[in-house]
Amino acid sequence: KLLKEYGSQKAAEKALEEKYGEMSRHPIVKMSKSLGNVINPDEVVDQYGADTMRLYEMFMGDFEQAAPWQTSAIAGCNRFLDRVWALSDKLVEGEGYRPQVETLMHQTIKKVGADIETLKMNTAIAQLMTLVNALYDNGGATKAELETVVQLLNPFAPHMTEELWEKLGHSHDEQLAYYPWPKYEEAKCVESTVEIAVQVLSLIHI
């Protein structure tokens, strides 16, 4: 697609250089059986699973723009799914969303929902990765926090999230795909800041 759009390999590589930096330094060639560079999706699924393949395809870039295929990046998506699953073994006590992650939870619900509607799947997934990192930074997740993560991740990794939904105590008949989408509160999407004025009396000259 890039070769057709830019007319030459040199022009296509320059375009990717501007957009992706070092990623674009790999030679750009068409996928062809004769060149032996065709990616077999079945092999990727066999190695990493269908959810990882699905997640990577939606994370690799905007649907309306071409992006280089990076097999190495698939492993990164697989590690992300592993981290989400591992949160089920790191549940912490507490009801609902904890104060330290509440704002990010509501921001993520809002952004993922909006991005799905506009087909910006890559930025929705990036937001989920940010949230998962924050949960790890805060020692894990409450059940409510992880349930929300699982719901938001379901469109991108349906098989794993359905299993994880059951692991969190939901019945097999309570299919996650038909469960109500999480709701956010606009007021809680805004970072709360407190300004504290500190006066050092020794520096005040009267």
Predicted regions and their residues:
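Short, positively charged
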Residues: 1-4, 9, 173-180
